[in-house]
């Protein structure tokens, strides 16, 4: 290896010729302990207008494992022309994601070895030779000491993950969640809390935890508890399928001791009457592990019926899963379970590209903001005298029903879907079952053509409606087009895996941060096969003002206040404002104040909000019609990368982004002219969130990326591609070339004018018309330019001529 000339080797060559031999010689197994090009993130989805694109992410060059699922070290390699430690910082970031203490950086000359387990006084980073790469046993021993594992823990900690043979492996955060939970349980911790954002695979994570504890014989009888039938069925039929005949779903209020894995609804094993408490059929020590799904909903509450199950099996290890731990005076997830062993937030999920970003459209209705007061002695549709007071947003569809308001909301939803796609899966969150039924009826009446095609276009899916509940599986199935619109109150707030939901409508009073996060979670799942990369929230009840709460950890891409008329009117500028962001001069407006909070306090309780379905009939509700319901003015707002509410056009975003990189026009043009391929700069700026199609729509001209940036960022007069091509011809620039070369360059200039610089930078353009009539690609190059270098030089000079800037006055 010492005789190998490294100086001209690429990064890939360094890995193949230097790194892999060093690792293998140290005793690492290529099948089970070494993975190359490990992609840890998916790449954040950037939404600009109607275009969504993923940000390109790098992969860890090599990750070393004790065994699959237990990572130990990260190796980052660079070409030999770089300094030996060039990849260290990149490697440290990957190590943080994987929670490993060892990082190796190399350029082929040796390794810089970063050892976070080093004792005080020892070097954290040191250089070692290729021959001194540590063995698997050496790193595992250091790792175990760093983690503080005992001998008794090791059989549990090293238990294999379930492998279905498909190559599917847990994502980095799932690995951390699983491994940290296993560590805690094997160390004797009996109450464990795991917090993972909706849509990040909590159930799959729970399966791997249970599988490893069960297979290692650490836990023999396991109870998985949920409070929705669909959650139990989804779990049994999907992630938990490998348990096979060892698993059962508790039914008939009977716990069968013949099974080891029991899946149960809380309601199926307990109730207010003693004979309903099926959990008492077995001894208190029957289960040694209980996993509680969506544990924020009651298991941590001392007076909850669910809590008596946990208290009865108090000797069992209890693991709580939730996206939203609940912390109020009455209920505390952390008081019961302790601090989370791991947290993966909505914000992290969106940043990593595992969850969908979203836009917000706020619709303000005049009676909501200004209130409505009955005339003296006015009666409602049932002949009841209406209490004389001002009814406002908190009252509507709770204690006061105004038919015109319901119809306006339904019409706005319909108009929005017509502008986007009438077949986009939509969930409408209503205040109660009665509201959900009225909303269903209003939407049916406003969509006769769609309902004629399929009478399940709109369905009410609530706890009281067996027909509606029977359609829930079809609604969440991406392959089933119907139902399209689901109106609901409580049933679909949690646990419903609606991957293709593209529109979430809020016509519900939501003051609970817990519930708000759960509802937002209905849309955050990504399904690229069906084109679902982002979604929209249509908010009629100011629920999205909870974004301003410091406890909310996943800011929206954009927020827009609008009117039903703007959504309905095809001639309005609603789409432009939503998709392109209305322009404001940057110096004039850099931010706006958050709108005033509603006249009630945001808490983390559900005291005011949608009614529990069993309590609806206890509330006195007035029902009126004939009320004039109108709209108010609109405003457009967006959240920036730091979560601050600003008013900014996409031009402003582009300006800020470019000025960070290139402070002056000279800096930018120098970089542009010096680049061998302009496409590289175009691609680099795309990675920073600049989407050319959207910028072109805002600028409104057929401009080259170079001109768009010079115009928008530096105030230069814009030239179209055709104008630039004509300017080159006017300068008689071609005369220094042979006739054959002039013909090629003249046609390249036409190609540039038609399609842009990226088109002419590909050598394959010479295979297209009209070049194909001039000969084969090698013939064209040889006849006109001598060789490939001559052609590249001529192309570079042509680009310099194209992008020549006019002289500027001092």
Swiss-Prot record:
Q: Write one Pfam family the protein is assigned to.
A: Helicase_C
The molecular function terms of the Gene Ontology recorded here are:
ATP binding; DNA binding; type I site-specific deoxyribonuclease activity
Ion transport in keyword set: no
Q: Which domain of life is it from?
A: Bacteria
Tagged with keyword Ion transport: no
The record's Gene3D superfamilies line, in alphabetical order, gives: 3.90.1570.30, P-loop containing nucleotide triphosphate hydrolases
Q: Supply the alphabetized keyword list.
A: ATP-binding, DNA-binding, Endonuclease, Hydrolase, Nuclease, Nucleotide-binding, Restriction system
Domain annotation Helicase ATP-binding: ranges: 183-343
List GO BP terms, alphabetically: DNA restriction-modification system
Could you tell me which residues belong to the region Disordered?
Answer: 578-608
The terms describing its cellular component in GO are: cytosol
Q: Which residues bind ATP?
A: 197-203
Instruction: Give residue spans, biased composition: Acidic residues.
Output: 578-588
The chemistry this enzyme catalyses reads: Endonucleolytic cleavage of DNA to give random double-stranded fragments with terminal 5'-phosphates, ATP is simultaneously hydrolyzed
Q: What is its EC number?
A: 3.1.21.3
Check the record and name the SUPFAM superfamilies matching this protein. P-loop containing nucleoside triphosphate hydrolases
> What residue stretches are annotated with the Helicase C-terminal domain?
412-575
Which SMART domains does this one have? DEXDc
The family assignment reads: Belongs to the HsdR family.
Q: What is the protein's known function?
A: The subtype B restriction (R) subunit of a type I restriction enzyme that recognizes 5'-GAGN(7)GTCA-3' and cleaves a random distance away. Subunit R is required for both nuclease and ATPase activities, but not for modification. After locating a non-methylated recognition site, the enzyme complex serves as a molecular motor that translocates DNA in an ATP-dependent manner until a collision occurs that triggers cleavage.
Q: How does it assemble?
A: The type I restriction/modification system is composed of three polypeptides R, M and S. The restriction enzyme has stoichiometry R(2)M(2)S(1) while the methyltransferase is M(2)S(1).
- What is the name of this protein? Type I restriction enzyme EcoAI endonuclease subunit
Organism for this UniProt entry: Escherichia coli
């Amino acid at each position: 290896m010492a005789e190998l000339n490294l100086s001209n080797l690429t990064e890939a060559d360094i890995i193949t010729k230097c790194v892999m031999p060093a690792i293998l010689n140290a005793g690492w197994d290529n099948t089970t302990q070494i993975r190359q090009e490990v992609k840890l993130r998916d790449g954040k989805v950037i939404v600009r207008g109607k275009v969504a694109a993923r940000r390109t992410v790098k992969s860890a060059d090599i990750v070393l494992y004790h065994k699959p699922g237990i990572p130990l070290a990260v190796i980052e390699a660079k070409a030999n022309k770089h300094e030996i430690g060039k990849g260290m910082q990149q490697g440290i970031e990957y190590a943080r994601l994987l929670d490993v203490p060892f990082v190796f950086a190399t350029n082929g000359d040796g390794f810089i070895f970063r050892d976070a387990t080093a004792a005080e006084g020892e070097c954290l980073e040191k250089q070692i030779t290729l021959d001194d790469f540590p063995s698997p046993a050496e790193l595992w021993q250091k790792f175990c000491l760093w983690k503080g594992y005992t001998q008794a823990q090791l059989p549990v900690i090293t238990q294999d993950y379930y492998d279905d043979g498909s190559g599917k492996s847990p994502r980095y955060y799932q690995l951390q969640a699983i491994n940290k939970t296993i560590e805690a349980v094997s160390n004797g911790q009996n109450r464990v809390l795991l917090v993972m954002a909706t849509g990040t695979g909590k159930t799959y994570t729970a399966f791997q935890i249970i599988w490893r504890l069960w297979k290692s014989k650490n836990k023999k009888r396991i109870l998985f508890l949920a409070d929705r039938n669909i959650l139990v069925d989804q779990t049994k039929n999907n992630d938990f399928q490998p348990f096979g005949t060892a698993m059962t779903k508790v039914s008939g209020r009977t716990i069968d001791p013949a099974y080891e894995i029991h899946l149960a609804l809380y309601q199926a094993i307990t109730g207010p009457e003693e004979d309903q408490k099926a959990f008492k059929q077995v001894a208190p020590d029957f289960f040694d592990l209980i996993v509680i799904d969506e544990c924020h909903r009651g298991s941590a509450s001392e007076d909850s019926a669910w809590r008596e199950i946990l208290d009865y099996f108090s000797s069992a290890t209890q693991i709580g899963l939730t996206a939203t731990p609940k912390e109020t005076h009455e209920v505390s997830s952390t008081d019961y379970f302790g601090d989370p062993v791991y947290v993966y937030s909505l914000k992290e999920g969106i940043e990593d590209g595992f969850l969908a970003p979203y836009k917000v459209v706020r619709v303000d209705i005049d009676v909501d903001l200004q209130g409505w007061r009955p005339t003296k002695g006015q009666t409602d549709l049932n002949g009841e005298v209406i209490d004389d007071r001002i009814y406002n947003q908190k009252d509507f569809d709770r204690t006061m029903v105004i038919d015109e308001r319901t119809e306006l909301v339904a019409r706005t939803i319909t108009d929005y879907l017509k502008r986007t796609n009438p077949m986009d899966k939509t969930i409408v969150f209503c205040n109660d079952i009665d509201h959900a039924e009225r909303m269903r009826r209003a939407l049916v009446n406003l969509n006769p053509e769609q309902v004629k095609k399929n009478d399940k276009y709109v369905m009410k899916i609530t706890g009281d409606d067996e027909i509606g509940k029977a359609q829930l599986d079809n609604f969440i199935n991406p392959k089933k087009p119907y139902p399209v619109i689901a109106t609901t109150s409580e049933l679909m707030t949690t646990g419903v895996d609606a991957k293709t939901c593209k529109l979430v409508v809020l016509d519900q009073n939501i003051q609970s941060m817990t519930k708000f996060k759960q509802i937002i979670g209905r849309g955050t799942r990504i399904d690229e096969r069906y084109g679902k990369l982002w979604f929209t929230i249509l908010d009629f009840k100011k629920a999205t003002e909870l974004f301003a709460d410091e406890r909310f950890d996943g800011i929206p891409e954009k927020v827009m206040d609008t009117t039903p008329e703007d959504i309905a009117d095809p001639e309005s500028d609603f789409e432009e404002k939503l998709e392109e962001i209305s322009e404001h001069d940057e110096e004039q407006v850099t931010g706006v104040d958050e709108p005033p909070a509603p006249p009630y306090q945001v808490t983390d309780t559900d005291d005011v909000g949608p009614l529990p379905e069993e309590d609806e009939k206890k509330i006195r509700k007035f029902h009126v019609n004939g009320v004039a319901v109108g709209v108010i003015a609109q405003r457009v707002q967006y959240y920036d990368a730091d979560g601050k509410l600003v008013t900014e056009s996409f031009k402003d975003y582009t300006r800020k982004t470019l000025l960070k990189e290139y402070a002056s026009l000279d800096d930018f043009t120098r970089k542009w002219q010096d680049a061998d391929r302009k496409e590289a700069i175009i691609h680099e700026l795309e990675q920073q969130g600049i989407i050319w199609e959207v910028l072109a729509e805002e600028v409104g001209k057929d401009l080259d990326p170079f001109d768009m940036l010079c115009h928008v960022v530096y105030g230069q007069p814009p030239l179209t591609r055709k104008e630039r091509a004509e300017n080159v011809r006017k300068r008689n620039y071609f005369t220094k070339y042979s006739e054959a070369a002039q013909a090629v360059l003249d046609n390249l200039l036409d190609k540039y004018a038609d399609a842009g610089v990226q088109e002419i930078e590909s050598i394959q353009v010479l295979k297209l018309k009209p070049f194909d009539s001039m000969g084969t690609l090698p013939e064209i190059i040889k006849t006109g330019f001598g060789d490939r270098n001559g052609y590249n030089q001529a192309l570079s000079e042509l680009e310099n001529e194209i992008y020549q800037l006019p002289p500027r006055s001092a």
